[in-house]
Each structure stands twice: as C-alpha cells, then as structure tokens.
Amino acid sequence: MSSGVQGGSAANANAYQTHPLRDAASALGTLSPQAYVDVVSAAQRNFLERMSRLASEQCDAQPVTDDARLDRLDDKPALRAPRSDAAHAADGNARGNGGASGAAKLTELLGVLMSVISASSLDELRQRSDIWNQMSKAAQDNLTSLSDKFQCATDDAKAATDAAERAAAAAKQAAADAKAADAAADAAQKRYDDAMKQGLPDDQLKTLQAALEQAKQQAGDAHARADALQADAAGKLDAATALATQAREWEQQIDDAVNQASRQYGASASLRTPPSPKLSGAAELTAVLGKLQELISSGNVKELESKQKLFTEMQAKREAELQKKSDEYQEQVKKAEEMQKTMGCIGKIVGWVITAVSFAAAAFTGGASLALAAVGLALAVGDEISRATTGVSFMDKLMQPVMDAILKPLMEVISSLITKALVACGVDQQKAELAGAILGAVVTGVALVAAAFVGASAVKAVASKVIDAVAGQLTKLMDSAIGKMLVQLIEKFSEKSGLQALGSRTATAMTRMRRAIGVEAKEDGMLLANRFEKAGTVMNVGNQVSQAAGGIVVGVERAKAMGLLADVKEAMYDIKLLGDLLKQAVESFAEHNRALAQLMQQMSDAGEMQTATGKLILRNARAV
C-alpha cells in the first residue's frame, strides 16, 4: 500500500486519495505549459520505475522454470498441477534455446511504451508550450505597455496635483494680501473722513487724500493679482482633474486586460509580478485622487466663502445707499410739498391784494365798477367758503375751460417745438420733454405778460375766447344745482354778515375819501381808476408768473424726487441680483461636490474590482 495517504484513515481512503500523483492532478488546471511537461514526464518515470520494480520482484521471488508465476505481478501464490519429466525437459530446452521470460517481455513492452509516449506526448506538449509562450509574451507586452502608459499618466496627474497645490497656496496668500490692502484702504478712508469733520487745513487734506488714493490703488492691484492667481489655480486644478481622469481610464484598461489574461491563461506564474514596497498602480492613483479631492473641496469652500463675503459686503453697501437715497427722496418730496403750499399761500395773498386794489379802483369810478368789485369780492369770499365746506373750488372749475382751451394748447405747442429742437441737437428724449415742458410754461407766461402790456388790440382774440369760455361756464354753473346753492349761500352770508350794509358804507366812505383827496371831476376819477387797474393787472400777471415759477420749482423738485426713486429701485434690483448670484454660487458648490462624490465612487469601484481580481487569483493559485 502507498504511504502517501492524506486526510483520513486507510480504511476510509479510496484509490484516488492514496494515489501518489493526486496532488499533481489537482494542479493541472493552474499549470503553465512547462509545468505540464514536467508533470507528465514525472508521471511517466514513476510508472516505468514502478513497473520495473514489480518485474524485478517477481523475477527474484520465483525460479525461471515457473512460467505461470512469472506471468503474475502480484504477491499471491500461483497454484498449478504437477508436471511430468518430459514437460520439464521441454521447458528446459526452450530456455536453453533462448526463450524470453515474463520480466523480459514486460521490460520490452515498457520500453516501447516509453518510446511512443516520448515521441507523441512530448512533441505535442512542446508545440502547445510554444504557442502558450507566444500568447503569454503578447499578453505580457500588452500589459507592460498599458502599465507604462498608466504610470506616465499617474506621474502627470501627481505633478499637476502638486502644481495645483502650489497655485492654491499662492492664491490664498494673495487673498490675504488683498484683505490687508482693503483694511489699509478703510483706515485711510477713516483718517480722511475724520480730517474732513475736524476741518483740517487743505495741505493736510490733500496729503490724506493722496494717501487714500494710493491705498485704494494698492487694494485694487492686490485684488487683481488675487483674482489672477485664483483663476490660475482653478485652471491648474481642472488640468489635474483631467489628468487624473485619464489615469483612471488607463487603470480601467489595465484591469480589463488583467481580467482577460486571468480568464484565458489562468493564474500563471509568468503573469505574476513581485510585490513592490512602495505604492504603485491603483494605490498610487487612489492617493493622488484623494489629494485632488481634498484640493477641490478646499478650493470650493474657499471660493464659496469668498463669494459670500463679497456679495454680503456689496449687498450691505447697496442697502446703505438705498437707505440714503430713500431719505433723500423723502426730503425732496417734503420740500416739493412745502414749496407747493408756500406758493399757494403767496398766490392767495396776492389774489386778495389784487381784489383789494380792484375794489379800491372801483371806488373812484363808482356805479357799475363798484358793483363788479362787490361781485368779485363776493365770489372770492364764496370760493373760500366753498373750499372750506366742500373741499372744492368753483373758481378753479370756472378757470378750467380757460386752461383747457387756451393756455394748455399754447403751452403744448411751444413745448413740442422746444422738445423737437432739443432732440435734433442730440438731447435725450426724456430730458428734452422735461425741458420743453418747463420752457413752454415760462414762454407762455412771458407771452401773456407781454400781451398785457402791448395793449388790448393784441389780446382781443384771446380776451374774447376767455370771456366766451368764462361766460359759458358761468352760465352752466349758475343753472346747475351747485350754482343755485351757491347763490343762496352767498345771499344768506351777505344778510347775516351785513355785507350789503358794508358795501353801502364802503361806497359812502370812498365818496368822502374821493372828495377829501380832491378828486371831484370824473376824468380824475377815471385816471386814478385806470392806474389802479393797471397796477392790479401787473400784480395779477406777477402772481401768475410767480405761480408758474413756483410750479416749475415744484416740478424740478419732484423730478429730483423721481430720480432718487429710480435710484432706489435700481439699488433694490442690484440687491436682488446679488442674492441671485449668491444662490448660483451655492448651486455651483453643490455641483462640484456631486462631481467629487462621483469621482470617489469610481475610485471605490476600481478598488473593489481590483480586490475581486486578487481574490480570483488567490483562489486559482494552488501548490503543485
């Protein structure tokens, strides 16, 4: 029995378990061609040695004349019938004649078998070994080429990563320098503002202003340098990312080639490489990608913080400007309202003075003029009462047709001509319209003043239109319920307040005053009345011009207020735009993080594939 029994007792062992070539047979699936040749040659030698040993043992244990015993190769005794002397003699003659024994025949058979096996099996195995070596050589060359390319890509990625690290450090230092320059500029600005508040001499102010300008220039240069270095760092980081991705692709090709070679050639010793004490291949690429991820993450965080700080500062400045513009807008609106109230009060005062002058002039003429003056005084008092009780001025309604039919068309025509002339000269349309409206109102007022001094012949048409418009509107007003109510109100007011008695007493007093100053003739009274009328006309024109000028001033103030309101809206839009930019920066940061997560996932997949390949090789690596 063989002594090579492994795993179990001899009673439970089968023939395969006790066979001396069991271990060699189990390794046939993982051997190279040369190993196959060695295994088969060893099996042949073991077989021939075993057969020769059995033949020698049989030959030594039995005499030569015992043919039956020589035909058996085991240790069992051979039983046979007794033989005669004649048979013994014949057998001896046969041996003497040179007959071959069983051991000799077995040796001859084994020699022929060995010759046949050596001639066929070894030649076939040698051919297969040559084919295997050629295929293995091609696979090794392919793997070597891929490995060289992968190593070059890894080295380039590592160099690019180092360059990106240096660029990031330079950008960080430049950002710190820019921050320091901003602090210096703020300090210079504060010193200059303090000097302005303290009222220092002009020489010191000029020196501080020059220092402030220099600090601002240095801060601007520092920011420009920081932006340039930041852009350079971002470019180098992108280049490093691209090279790392390329190295990852070469690594994937190497993994595919190794897996294909493992499936095709098995875990051959010729495909195995000795372990290296330093990081190589996927491990080195993983280290490079990890460092690259750290750089990208750090750069993204710093970029987001920088943008957030910049946007916050810009937003704070715009909010301060917005508050300032809002305060200025409120101030301009308040000034316009005060100006409008002031001009209204002035107009009322001048109107009452004109009414008084007209009433005084009527005293020298008497008769119908005095009655008209009383009517004018009553209308003025009634207009104030109506404005106080109802909030509506019927005198404004009476003058509205005059404005609509005469003054407004005239102002619009003059304003249109001035606007077209300004636009033809290259002035902006909006500014030309504003200037045309202001100049149109001024020219119209000047034209009315000139017409008043030129004479009645020049304003006859205008006066007729005014009289017709006022008469028609007055007739409609008197026929309406408002007019009737106004008449009743004036009558009651005159009765209660003694306005009629006041009128008669005033006429008597004026007659006495006329006599006292020596105006007895009618011509003298008419002369004084004409002078009073001229003075009233001049004052009325002056009132209208002052009201127009006041309206222009109020319009200018309102235009300034509208400009401030436009600035406020622009500042609000800038604040909204800054918020949108900050939102885009956050989205870009999230996108970069997603890209990094995908890159790390690919690295993890590559490591998992490499681990699976190593496990496959270890499972197929068996001892021969």
UniProtKB/Swiss-Prot annotation:
Q: Where in the cell is it found?
A: Secreted; Host membrane
What's in the keyword line of the UniProt record?
Coiled coil, Host membrane, Membrane, Secreted, Transmembrane, Transmembrane helix, Virulence
Coiled-coil ranges per UniProt:
313-343
The superkingdom listed in its UniProt entry is Bacteria
Q: Cellular component GO terms, alphabetically? A: extracellular region; host cell membrane; membrane
Locate the region Disordered.
54-99
Q: What this chain does, per the record?
A: Plays a role in the bacterium-induced formation of multinucleated giant cell (MNGC), which is formed after host cell fusion, as well as in the intercellular spreading of bacteria and in the induction of apoptosis in macrophages. May act in concert with other effector proteins to induce fusion of host cell membranes.
Protein name in the entry: Translocator protein BipB
- Organism this protein belongs to: Burkholderia thailandensis (strain ATCC 700388 / DSM 13276 / CCUG 48851 / CIP 106301 / E264)
Designated gene of the protein: bipB
